[in-house]
Amino acid sequence: PQYTIKLEGAKCIGYRTVSVAGTRDPIMISKIDDIVEGVRARVADNYRDKGYKYNLNFTIYGKNGVMGDLEPVKDAHPHELGIVIEVVADTQEQADTICASARSTMLHYGYEGRRATAGNLAFPFSPSDFHAGRVYVFSMYHIIEVEDPTSLFPIDIVTL
């Protein structure tokens, strides 16, 4: 028979910080895509000279938050949105900094028709940002064909 051994590996790609918020403002909800892009652009501009490598992700629950682009309901009209701001960066400090900037920018982001100037978001947790630790991705997936499935795993029995 042909034996195979599966090898898998993961590597750390950075550190994650998350902020969870919500909004019920119908004007903000109607403009959420433009607001997210505006926040993303402002954060990128603010940190352009720092040399940070990061990934800033917004998941909007109530509007494609679960299925993303595969969502079949294209013109939903939710009365509230859950917003998860997620940052993965090279260090925890950088992830914290970018997440805080994105959260604060979105909280006070100006948009046409805005009425509330005290803040656009509600936060279920205080503090609003929290560490989610190291982030890993698969870095190796390999199948080895061997004649003897035990040859790579020697066993030594020692009697004490």
Regions found by a protein language model. Name each.
Residues 2-160:
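C-terminal non-catalytic interaction/assembly regions of soluble proteins
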